[in-house]
């Protein structure tokens, strides 16, 4: 087998016909500036070809189900293995997908509970065991010799009625005696039963004495009793004690039944086991009392009930006042001071009690009727479900939230599944074990109390569960729970989960391609991740990791630096070799940072801010432990802490949503907290994330930043356009008029090839320009609109230097380091880091009030150290204008430049959720309890 992968003539995206050799069975890191061509080499060339070759080996019939793989633009690749890509984009947003289902641990847990679980009655009647006739007979024969007993068949358990037909059937079947409510009667002398009382009726099948040779008769009698009572039998020992047996998993006392234990019973994705109320989602759309009564200090007359306050008619306020008068509830008392009984009446109605309602509308219509008071919550529910009006449904939805399902308490499963426990009655059910953190889950699984027989059955299942939990633990995910929805995971978390799954598969000879697995990982956990990557390598796999993390680069066997710049200025191999060899390469920007020749400097002084702050008091969402956090305004703030310490909960779930609720009247409810102060000091909240700036190729930097509007205005003002009567819309490729209709302004045409990949060719009519020939005859400075869209931002800044409105917007794109991007480049081809900087550029050219609050969650994702240096300069401009910038970040180069740090921890999950230290980087570095401080110390002193 070849000892290296050899690529000849790679030209995907901006790659410049490069040749590169990659050693096999090594940990190879591909690095370079954002947009330099790293992903084009790793994913769009290597992975695409590896996957395509595998699919090509399948039959034409199988290929039609897998979709067609496009051949990457490369001359040849030798020594390629089957490729598996682990990137950040494939997280399932399906609410049924959880950490447990993604890692397949749920499958093993379901098997464990089906094989060694014991059901317990949900009404507290103890263990429910299913017994065969043979087992029941053996149990009865353990009773002392000469013991007298009755064998009873319980046909009625706690049911109201006279049950005459039951007694008649017993008599017809030839039985002589029945026991009714504890008294034995001749079947012909049973007294008339009360219709309104609950009764128990047992058929006396046999009366016997335990002695030698009785087994055969006992067997027949028990079998008959089980048949009559549909699987139940009572052994009455005639001395006030009874033995209850069942052929099924059913409680003999209350009749609670559990079907046969099999894995599907424990799946919330199958109707057999899922909660019928929420269909296995664990959450339901319910009316949220906090949204119905947003300000409990108001009285009913002042409008405490939001849905019935600002309304087009007075119908509901009238109804409320008349009902409250009848039911004796004060209209002028603050809602919070009303009794629980009164609050329940207002929210949930009068439980059938009626009042007289008189109402006259503005058109003279009169309503005079005796009706029960419905209650505001029931009213919202009814109108939401019954209305045909989209407007009404939207209005009612404002007062609803996804709340934990009250039937299954969020466990997603039905009572039958949740009645089964492992490790005795005090052991966990499958919902409880899934709610434990990975670390606690590991401890519990190692300490389960099982019988000798159960231990033998469970051993192989527990091994698989432990192995997978250990892998998750080793990649820094010890704080996650198996019940956590996959859609709530960050890109880094979901990637490390799939990484753990791959480690568990123990494959060898595979080419793994990873995209920044260190995202969202604290420096403390980085070593464990690198150890996991090395373990995969040692199994005989080749790992190609697109990464900017300095520690990962230094630990790599081989380092490839793509560059030297980004976009058209990149696409070449600048350096390749061991990390030490790359560090000595003077042409490599990466090498200069590795050798210490280039550094991001520590600011000489920290900003003091404007003296104001926003304060969140008593935050208690997820793992936050009644945290109070103060965010000083006019500063660059970094929120830090190990993975799972509560950073995202504090910022994204509470601070961001609380500010948005106040400033933007956003209905998205923040997490639990007591109060928040200081929002009046900011006038705008801007969340700048790495999501795409557009979902279709029609969206591009020019349209996103708004500069295309100005450019179209400029073209419409040229003499040629005026003579022809062309308006601004003529120069849009999205509407009829100026665009090429053959390709609808796309510039390309898709040709379906069925069993071969779809082919995209330039439109034959417009030759890829997007516009018709008449539109292209209009020029500004000898360039038509299509040629302008093909310009890089750098070229366009010069081209439009005498048009300040356009030049200013383009300059901001250049300032954030995106000068290499073309104005018409499809938004779908921009990386996450590029999209984020495009959003920053769009913000930069807006007039600043100095009271904006910017939030960025891990802005360094996908950014090289050189890109980070540029990003920090842009963020500094926002702060220098008086605004506040807050970043959630693990990157020490960013943290060391902050004015103020809020460090959460000390651990992730239940071990986190408190603020360890706040202050300047120097103050945090001096704190012994802070993991961030420990690593920061080296950075500050090193500089």
Swiss-Prot record:
Gene3D superfamilies: ABC transporter ATPase domain-like, ABC transporter ATPase like domain, ATP-grasp fold, A domain, P-loop containing nucleotide triphosphate hydrolases. Its main location: cytoplasm. It comes from Streptococcus pneumoniae serotype 4 (strain ATCC BAA-334 / TIGR4). One of its GO terms (cellular component) is excinuclease repair complex. The UvrABC repair system catalyzes the recognition and processing of DNA lesions. UvrA is an ATPase and a DNA-binding protein. A damage recognition complex composed of 2 UvrA and 2 UvrB subunits scans DNA for abnormalities. When the presence of a lesion has been verified by UvrB, the UvrA molecules dissociate. GO terms for molecular function: ATP binding; ATP hydrolysis activity; DNA binding; excinuclease ABC activity; zinc ion binding. Belongs to the ABC transporter superfamily. UvrA family. Forms a heterotetramer with UvrB during the search for lesions. The keyword Zinc applies. PANTHER family: UVRABC SYSTEM PROTEIN A. SUPFAM superfamilies: P-loop containing nucleoside triphosphate hydrolases (SSF52540). NCBIfam families: PRK00349.1, uvra. A zinc finger (C4-type) spans 251-278, 740-766. This is UvrABC system protein A. Residues 308-589, 609-937 form the ABC transporter domain. One of its GO terms (biological process) is SOS response. ATP binds at residues 32-39, 641-648. The keyword Iron does not apply.
